[in-house]
């Protein structure tokens, strides 16, 4: 086992804070409407230019082991926030840095770190409550567009595209982001359905970049039982192979010899097949298979209606224009089902929604309507160069997550204002059990100004002046860094999803507390560089060459 370095107390924390600062300083330059770009090196091809906090954080690995530990913990804040809320990664990183920086001073002054942590937790709980109280539901398409624009770094066209997409497929509809073919971004709505089952074997993948299997113009076989014997499938496979088209098999389970044979045929390129499990369970599974059958114009092969696998003809199979199968999702795009049949099915499910007694059943039925009627909206991102396209696509994906979060939990005033108002509302209400906990509460209430300060710094303003001006105002009064003016943030359309602000604060405090309560760090000791092999004598004698009378 390699030797380890163990570092204690103040020295350990100081090295860790250096790492936190390096990562946070690189991430926070992207915050706000006047945030800058960060260029990331790629091992091949052009560098990536981004204004997305989590993309920057993910790239950072530091040489110093102890600094790197601090940086990796803050990276966790960014990626956790990205996973939960889809946006707010830069805000979370800035908050984490501020809490660590303030907290570090207190710990150095001899305050108990565990009590400090308890104080931080109390303050965060109170602030989250205030954020929830201040939250306002998003109802209009305009508000959704505003949330999207802010998240896409003040790009109004992106916000509008997302709002249009949500209008067309409904708030429960499926929205995907793809590379466009032209300079402008555009919205494409495709009839389709998504369900939460992915491929049964990774060997079905034919698009390694997206880690998915794409089938163009495939047949769809729907079977309500397990398939383990390949002989049952052979008649269908032979007919599909003759037609020269791919096949998607949706069954309760495909296992053993049947799955192995399908995989081998796919790898050898004899037949393009993908197998997935049927979505749902029990009666719901039957209903969803029936939905897919109606959407694709096929039949569910079930013994109770007198159909068996051996007797299947191509007429019994559904068809679609394209099917994408990922690790956890399958999207059927442009099924061949008759519009009248789909409409009748939607009506039937809507009647069931009215009769449903439990909220859970109602929610599941509404999901089915969204899948049958909603379709899939595809946002095609256009740009002049591939580098710009990647950067823009990342922003569109961020904005999409933010708008979903806004629909879920509502919105608060953006630009760091909601946090300041929550701070004012909490004021002196929250008390710790002792002076050390009070210090933790005070620390969070000071650190919470950091996002607004950073937005102002990036816009070239004087942070303290702006923070005091905003604190002097009331309600949604805040600072618009895009044009250096003050006003009502909601009226100006500067909104943040409550979920994003809340998640950023909670994750930042959680990781910052861990850093502050650290007392020792263990890392691999740096390897000693061995000297030149073979014990060569030193060349000191060469210095006398000056006297050779040259």
Curated annotation (Swiss-Prot):
Keyword Isomerase part of the UniProt annotation: yes
Q: Where does ATP bind?
A: 30-33, 51, 87-91, 415, 480-482, 496
Which EC number applies?
Answer: 5.6.1.7
Primary residence: cytoplasm
Alphabetically, which GO biological process terms does the record hold?
protein refolding
Keyword Cytoplasm listed? The answer is yes
Pfam families named in the record: Cpn60_TCP1
Q: What class of enzyme is it?
A: isomerase
Q: Which UniProt key words apply to this protein?
A: ATP-binding, Chaperone, Cytoplasm, Isomerase, Nucleotide-binding
Q: Which reaction does it catalyse?
A: ATP + H2O + a folded polypeptide = ADP + phosphate + an unfolded polypeptide
Gene3D superfamilies xrefs: GroEL, GroEL-like equatorial domain, TCP-1-like chaperonin intermediate domain
For this record, the Gene Ontology CC terms, alphabetical, are: cytoplasm
Q: Where in the cell is it found?
A: Cytoplasm
GO terms of molecular function: ATP binding; ATP-dependent protein folding chaperone; isomerase activity; unfolded protein binding
Tell me the domain of life. Answer: Bacteria
User: How does this protein assemble?
Assistant: Forms a cylinder of 14 subunits composed of two heptameric rings stacked back-to-back. Interacts with the co-chaperonin GroES.
- List the PANTHER family hit by this protein, alphabetically: 60 KDA HEAT SHOCK PROTEIN, MITOCHONDRIAL
Q: Which HAMAP family match?
A: CH60
Its function, per the record, reads:
Together with its co-chaperonin GroES, plays an essential role in assisting protein folding. The GroEL-GroES system forms a nano-cage that allows encapsulation of the non-native substrate proteins and provides a physical environment optimized to promote and accelerate protein folding.
The Swiss-Prot or TrEMBL record describes its family as follows:
Belongs to the chaperonin (HSP60) family.
The protein's name: Chaperonin GroEL
């Amino acid at each position: 086992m390699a030797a380890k370095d163990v570092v204690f107390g103040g020295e350990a924390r100081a090295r860790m804070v250096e790492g936190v600062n390096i990562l946070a300083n690189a991430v926070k330059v992207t915050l706000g409407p006047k945030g800058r770009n960060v260029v990331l090196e790629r091992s091949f091809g052009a560098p990536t230019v981004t204004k997305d906090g989590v993309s920057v954080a993910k790239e950072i690995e530091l040489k110093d082991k102890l600094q790197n530990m601090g940086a990796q913990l803050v990276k966790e804040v960014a990626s956790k926030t990205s996973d939960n809320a889809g946006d707010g990664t830069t805000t979370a990183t800035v908050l984490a840095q501020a809490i660590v920086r303030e907290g570090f001073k207190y710990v150095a002054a001899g305050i108990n770190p565990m009590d400090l942590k308890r104080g931080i937790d109390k303050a965060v709980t109170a602030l989250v409550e205030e954020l929830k109280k201040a939250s306002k539901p998003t109802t209009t398409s305009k508000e959704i567009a505003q949330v999207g624009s802010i998240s896409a770094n003040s790009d109004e066209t992106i916000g509008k595209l997302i709002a249009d997409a949500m209008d067309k497929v409904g708030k429960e509809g499926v929205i995907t982001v793809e590379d466009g073919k032209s300079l402008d971004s555009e919205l494409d709505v495709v009839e389709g359905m998504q369900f939460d089952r992915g491929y049964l074997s990774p060997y079905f993948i034919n698009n390694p970049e997206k880690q998915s299997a794409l089938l163009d113009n495939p047949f769809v076989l729907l079977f309500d039982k397990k398939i383990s014997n390949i002989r049952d499938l052979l008649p269908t496979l032979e007919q599909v192979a003759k037609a020269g088209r791919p096949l998607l098999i949706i069954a309760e389970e495909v296992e053993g010899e049947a799955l192995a044979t399908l995989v081998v045929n796919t790898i050898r390129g004899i037949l393009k097949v993908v197998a997935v499990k049927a979505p749902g369970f029990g009666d719901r599974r039957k209903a969803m298979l029936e939905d897919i059958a109606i959407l694709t114009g096929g039949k569910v092969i079930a013994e109770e209606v007198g159909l068996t696998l051996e007797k299947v003809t191509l007429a019994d199979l559904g068809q679609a224009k394209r099917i994408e199968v990922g690790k956890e999702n399958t999207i059927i795009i442009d099924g061949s089902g008759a519009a009248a049949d789909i409409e009748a099915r939607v009506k039937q499910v809507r009647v069931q929604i009215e009769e449903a007694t439990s909220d859970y059943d109602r929610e599941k039925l509404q999901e089915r309507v969204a899948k049958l009627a909603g379709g899939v909206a595809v946002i095609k991102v256009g740009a002049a160069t591939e580098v710009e396209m990647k950067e823009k696509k990342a922003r569109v994906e961020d904005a999409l997550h933010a708008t979903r979060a806004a629909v879920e939990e509502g919105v608060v005033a953006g630009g760091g204002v909601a946090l300041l108002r929550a701070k004012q509302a909490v004021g002196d209400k929250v008390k710790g059990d002792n002076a050390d906990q009070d210090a933790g509460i005070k620390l969070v209430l000071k650190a919470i100004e950091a996002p607004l300060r950073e937005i102002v710094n990036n816009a070239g303003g004087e942070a303290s002046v702006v923070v005091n001006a905003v604190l002097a105002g009331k309600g949604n009064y805040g600072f618009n860094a895009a044009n250096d003016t003050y006003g009502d943030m909601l009226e100006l359309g500067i909104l943040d999803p409550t979920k994003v602000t809340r998640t950023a604060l909670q994750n930042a405090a959680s990781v910052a507390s861990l850093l502050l309560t650290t007392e020792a760090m263990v890392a691999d000791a740096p390897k000693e560089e061995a000297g030149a092999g073979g014990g060569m004598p030193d060349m000191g004698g060469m210095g006398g060459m000056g006297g050779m009378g040259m």
